[in-house]
Every structure is written in C-alpha cells, then in structure tokens.
C-alpha cells in the first residue's frame, strides 16, 4: 500500500523522485521510509521522509579525536605530589620574571609607606600627602598580590625576594620635601612601568599570550595614568614653590 502510494506520488511529481544517497558501488546503509497524509486547502498530500541508519557506515572527515589528542606529552597530567596540575605552556622565564615583578611592587610599596610615615609626623603634618602615599603603598602591595595570585593560577611557584630598606627622611633644602618626594614617586612609577614592559616582553618571547593579556589588561593602562597624575602634581608644586602654597596643595590631596 505504501509502495503504491509512493509510486503514484513520484509519477505525478517526477522532479521529486528520490535520488540515490550513496555513490554507485558504495555499501548501502539501511533506509527507512515514513509516510504521512496531510489535508489542507481542500487537497490531500502524501509526505514521504527517509532516514539513513549510519551506525554501520565508516566515520569520515573527523578533525578532533579527544581521546587521542590528550595522549600528547604536553597534555600529560603530573602524578607527583609536588608538581603543578594547572601548569600549561608556562615557561620558566615567565615564572621568574613574575617573581621579580612581585619584588618590584613590594619594594615600591615599601618606599611609599616610608613617605606616608614621614608626612604623617607631627613636625611635618601634611595629612594630604600622607594620605596620598599611604594609598599608593596599598595600591602597589595590591599589585604584588595580583601577580602572586596569577603565578599560582598558572602553576608557578611564588618566591619572595628581600626588600631593600627605604630612606625615612625626605627633606630637601632646595626643592622642599613635598616636591622632592613627588619627583621620587614619579621616578618609581616610570621604573615600575619599565619592569612591566619587560614582563610583557618575556611573555611575547615565550609565546604566552595569556600572560601578555594579563599585564596589558591589569597594569599597563593604569600605569600611564599614574605617571600622568604625578607629573601634574610635580608641575603644580614647582609653580607654587616651598611657601604657603604647599599647604593648599596638601589640602587639595586631603579633600
């Protein structure tokens, strides 16, 4: 009955005659036919659908075989307890330069903390500058912690290096302590920027786009903003000299 219906339907519609699904001579998979009768607009239409059982057909054109790919040596999972499971495409040079940058950030933070302590003295009493350098110290320490977290994410090992003891006096007979400290801060920010660019360079040399992206997105833009802000402060301090204007500048930072 179904065969007669299909023959009648294709005879009346030669353009819809079924085409061979496989090239001549190929193994024939099992084909099942389904028919349905739809009524609409005063017409009855027989719809035929064919499905091919491909269970017995060879798979061709496979481009990704996960169970074979994971057997590659660089994807092997370490079995020793001291080895990182997360580490992948993370060069020793990248690990080392991150530890160096952690040390840079902590050293700069330490200098800023010394500046904060100086300007917070009762015989200096520049609360605005003290606030600015305390916030700067906390920011640099936060940068060090970001690098430590990233080191752990990539499977590296954080190694903290010694921190140099900073100076504690910032008096300067010619410039005054505010301008002298701010110029020192600008030098530190430019030095930090150079060190960050070196981290980015090492990442590029070792084909590590993830480390390069981390430095770009988290630090480089922020660093040039800090350089511009401190440069503006230096220009203002140079204009007002060592007199009463320094107090007004300090109040501006405080408020």
UniProtKB/Swiss-Prot annotation:
GO biological process annotation, one example: intracellular iron ion homeostasis
Organelle targeting sequence: 1-48
Catalytic activity: 4 Fe(2+) + O2 + 4 H(+) = 4 Fe(3+) + 2 H2O
Regulation: induction: Up-regulated by iron overload treatment, and by H(2)O(2). Up-regulated by the phosphate starvation response transcription factor PHR1.
Enzyme Commission identifier(s): 1.16.3.1
Binding site for Fe cation 2: 140, 189, 223
Keywords: Chloroplast, Iron, Iron storage, Metal-binding, Oxidoreductase, Plastid, Transit peptide
Any GO MF annotation of the entry: ferroxidase activity
Pfam families for the chain: Ferritin (PF00210)
Gene3D superfamilies according to UniProt: 1.20.1260.10
GO cellular component, one term: thylakoid
Designated name of the protein: Ferritin-1, chloroplastic
Complexes and interactors: Oligomer of 24 subunits. There are two types of subunits: L (light) chain and H (heavy) chain. The major chain can be light or heavy, depending on the species and tissue type. The functional molecule forms a roughly spherical shell with a diameter of 12 nm and contains a central cavity into which the insoluble mineral iron core is deposited.
Subcellular location per the Swiss-Prot or TrEMBL entry: Plastid, Chloroplast
Top-level EC class: oxidoreductase
Keyword hit for Coiled coil: no
Function (record text): Stores iron in a soluble, non-toxic, readily available form. Important for iron homeostasis. Has ferroxidase activity. Iron is taken up in the ferrous form and deposited as ferric hydroxides after oxidation.
Domain annotation Ferritin-like diiron: ranges: 88-241
UniProt superkingdom: Eukaryota
Keyword presence, Iron: yes
Gene name of the record: FER1
Binding site for Fe cation 1: 105, 140, 143
Organism (species): Arabidopsis thaliana
């Amino acid at each position: 009955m179904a065969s007669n219906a299909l023959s009648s339907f294709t005879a009346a519609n030669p353009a819809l005659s079924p085409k061979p699904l496989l090239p001549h001579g190929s193994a024939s998979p099992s084909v099942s036919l389904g028919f349905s009768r739809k009524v609409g607009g005063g017409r009855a239409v027989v719809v035929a659908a064919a499905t091919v059982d491909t269970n017995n057909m060879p798979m061709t054109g496979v481009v990704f075989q996960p169970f074979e790919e994971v057997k590659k040596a660089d994807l092997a999972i370490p079995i020793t307890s001291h080895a990182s499971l997360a580490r992948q495409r993370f060069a020793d040079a990248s690990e080392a330069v991150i530890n160096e940058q952690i040390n840079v950030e902590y050293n700069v933070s330490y200098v800023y903390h010394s500046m904060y302590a100086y300007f917070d003295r009762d015989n200096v009493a520049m609360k605005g500058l003290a606030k600015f350098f305390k916030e700067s110290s906390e920011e640099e320490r936060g940068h060090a912690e970001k690098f430590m977290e990233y080191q752990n994410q990539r499977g590296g090992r954080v190694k903290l290096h010694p921190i140099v003891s900073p100076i504690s006096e910032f008096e300067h007979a010619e410039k005054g302590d505010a301008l002298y400290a701010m110029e020192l801060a600008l030098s530190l920010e430019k030095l930090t920027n150079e060190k960050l660019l070196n981290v980015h360079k090492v990442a590029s040399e070792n084909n590590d786009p993830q480390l390069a992206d981390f430095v770009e997105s988290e630090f480089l833009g922020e660093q040039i903003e800090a350089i511009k802000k401190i440069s503006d402060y230096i220009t203002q301090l140079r204009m007002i000299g060592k007199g009463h204007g320094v107090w007004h500048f300090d109040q501006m930072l405080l408020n």
